Amino acid sequence: LIKGRRSVRRYRDRDLAPELIDELLEISCHAPTGVNSRSVLFTVVRERAVMNRLRDHLISRLAQLQDEGRLPEGLTGKYLGRAVIAWQQEGKDILFRGAPHLIITSAPADAPCPVQDTLIALTTFQLIAHAHGVGTVWDGIFMMALAACPDVAGRLGIPENHTLGYAMAFGEPAVEYHRTVQRGPALVNVVKW
């Protein structure tokens, strides 16, 4: 399960069955949380049509920021600017990699471990999705876009008092991997007190 998991950046152009999404969420909500707070919110885009509207809105906003010279500095601005150009000139979706669905985890800022809980929940979702043949990718470009357009979180229904965890695009993979990635040995530090 762990060794076979791969990031998927190409998806089939169709929605997953709603029952499958429900099953993935139902299992994922059992992920461990600090002090058993169980306060992780899963914000989900369940339909490709909604993803298309979200992407169009974000690309429009990012293009406006780019035109006004207000994209973030450094690599973040470079990646976001490239996402705008790729969509406008080539129809290439770097923001969501063509995935029909998106999940964002968040938790109340006053929860005992809001960041850790959201990342554990999203990792659980990823592994359960992989076990069901669903492809996923941690969506850092979307997180950059969300930071550049913070009001979008509210439009997605994420409460103001929540700490954002991370986002993951997902859907039916349009690519099949026949072997795992060969990785080096684990980095281990053995403590000798």
What are these regions (language model features)?
Residues 23-29, 101-154, 168:
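Small-aliphatic-rich amphipathic alpha-helix that forms the alpha element of a beta-alpha
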Residues 27-29, 86-91, 151-155, 174-176:
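Glycine-rich, charged/polar anion/phosphate-binding loops
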Residues 34-37, 94-97, 156-161:
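Solvent-exposed alpha-helices and their adjacent loops that cap or buttress functional pockets
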Residues 89, 158-193:
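C-terminal helix-cap and adjacent tail motif
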